[in-house]
């Protein structure tokens, strides 16, 4: 990503794979890819890719050429690049990290900036995988239902952005950073229809625990490991959804100094009985605590409850 023009090639940089359809004159005609917290590939298929490519080919014939060359912006514009070294490979997820670093340095960053590329489910839309702009389901009482969308509708645009895939829908939602109503246009039985998506506070939020770019966000919980199985939880009297993270072989210095040991089972924080996975737990800490905060990890050790106080130190 070192020399990629970020002003032109905009996509979700946390993805394992992303595709953009670009015309010879430089127009981005569409995007393909996207994922959710459940699966890295549940939102994509070869049929869906072909469907999006056909839409891009049609757009190439119909859309006017660009009036001017897009601005050029690369990771070299972010001061944080210096810490990676002049020859280091810049991975996709590091673009998000560099952008975050720049905003933090200017005092313009807040937790609300974490919610990038919200999935269409956030506005009540589930799209077909093989036909990425066809509505498979509309959630009851959602923004999509209130706007008038129904199963089988074919979405043309969201916020003025053409939609032919899950990634297109995410991009359109990503560009809309406010709670103001968002325009949508769709086809029903060949007839064009339009409506407004009325967005509630926090509409961008979703499970972002899969995002690699969050790993460097502080504070670190300083614990890591694997989830207990359902059978192991049941044997300990824990519910199936209860947090039960077994501390791994390597115990970080902050955790070790606090008294946490290998195979300790983290089941809560500050007395809260959390229902989440071990992958979601670090994000919970990052969203609810700051560097320097003292937390009490609620543990099970050899079947007995143990409370350990740990200071969420910053990285060296």
Locations of regions flagged by a protein language model:
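Thiol-based oxidoreductase modules, predominantly thioredoxin-like and allied folds used
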Residues: 1-4
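Short consensus segments that form the blades of beta-propeller domains
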Residues: 8-12
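A generic structural motif
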Residues: 35, 161, 169, 199-200, ...
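Sequence context surrounding c-type heme c attachment/ligation sites in exported
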Residues: 35-124, 129
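PDZ/PDZ-like peptide-tail recognition elements
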Residues: 90-137, 196-245, 307-316
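PDZ/PDZ-like domain segments forming the peptide/carboxylate-binding groove
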Residues: 117-157, 161-164, 221-268, 272-276
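PDZ-domain C-terminal substructure recognizer with occasional recognition of PDZ-binding tails
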Residues: 156, 171-210, 258-261, 267, ...
């Amino acid at each position: 990503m070192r020399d990629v023009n970020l002003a032109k090639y905009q996509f979700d940089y946390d993805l394992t794979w992303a595709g953009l359809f670009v015309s010879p004159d430089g127009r981005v005609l569409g995007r393909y890819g996207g994922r959710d917290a459940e699966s890295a590939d549940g939102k994509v298929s070869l049929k869906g890719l072909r469907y999006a490519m056909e839409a891009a080919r049609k757009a190439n014939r119909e859309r006017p050429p660009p009036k001017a060359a897009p601005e050029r912006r690369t990771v070299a514009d972010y001061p944080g690049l210096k810490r990676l070294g002049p020859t280091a490979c810049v991975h996709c997820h590091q673009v998000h990290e560099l952008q975050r670093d720049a905003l933090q340095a200017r005092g313009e960053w807040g937790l609300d900036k974490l919610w990038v590329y919200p999935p269409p489910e956030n506005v009540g839309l589930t799209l077909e995988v093989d036909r990425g702009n066809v509505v498979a389901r509309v959630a009851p009482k959602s923004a999509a239902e209130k706007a008038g969308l129904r199963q089988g509708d074919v979405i043309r645009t969201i916020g003025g952005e053409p939609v032919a895939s899950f990634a297109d829908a995410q991009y359109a939602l990503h560009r809309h950073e406010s709670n103001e109503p968002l325009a949508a246009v769709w086809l029903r039985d060949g007839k064009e229809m339009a409506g407004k998506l009325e967005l509630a506070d926090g509409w961008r939020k979703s499970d972002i625990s899969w995002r690699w770019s969050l790993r460097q966000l502080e504070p670190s919980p300083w614990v890591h490991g694997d989830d207990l199985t359902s059978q192991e939880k049941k044997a300990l009297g824990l519910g199936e959804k209860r947090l039960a993270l077994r501390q791994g072989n390597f115990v970080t210095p902050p955790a070790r100094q606090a008294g946490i040991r290998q195979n300790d089972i983290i089941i809560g924080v500050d007395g809260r009985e959390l229902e989440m996975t071990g992958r979601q737990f670090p994000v919970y800490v990052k969203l609810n605590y700051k560097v320097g905060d003292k937390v009490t990890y609620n543990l099970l050790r050899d079947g007995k409850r143990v409370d350990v106080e740990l200071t969420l130190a910053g990285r060296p």
